From Swiss-Prot:
Residues 1-72 form the Carrier domain. Carrier of the growing fatty acid chain in fatty acid biosynthesis. It comes from the Bacteria. It comes from Mycoplasmopsis pulmonis (strain UAB CTIP). This is Acyl carrier protein homolog. Pathway: Lipid metabolism; fatty acid biosynthesis. The lineage of its organism: Bacteria, Bacillati, Mycoplasmatota, Mycoplasmoidales, Metamycoplasmataceae. InterPro entries: ACP (IPR003231), ACP-like_sf (IPR036736), PP-bd_ACP (IPR009081). GO terms for cellular component: cytosol; membrane.
């Protein structure tokens, strides 16, 4: 499964809202605590580290997709 699909599938478990790459976390009902918990899962799944500074810059689903794609190379 590609990174984008995996992330959207995982995020879909946290909300009933439809999730797309352009979805803002604030609009789909995922708060900062949910995001921190999810990032921990992402770090383990993709064997990467996401810094607190990088986490603060994540506002929409595509932000995290791009970040993980960059770190997975």
């Amino acid at each position: 499964m590609a990174i984008k699909e995996w992330i959207i599938t995982q995020l879909s478990k946290l909300t009933k809202n439809k999730i797309t790459e352009e979805s803002l976390f604030s609009e789909i009902g995922i708060d900062s605590l949910d995001l921190v918990e999810h990032v921990s899962d992402l770090e383990q799944h993709f064997d990467i580290e996401i810094s607190d500074e990088e986490l603060l810059n994540i506002k929409k689903v595509n932000d995290i997709i791009v970040l993980i794609e960059q770190k997975s190379k």
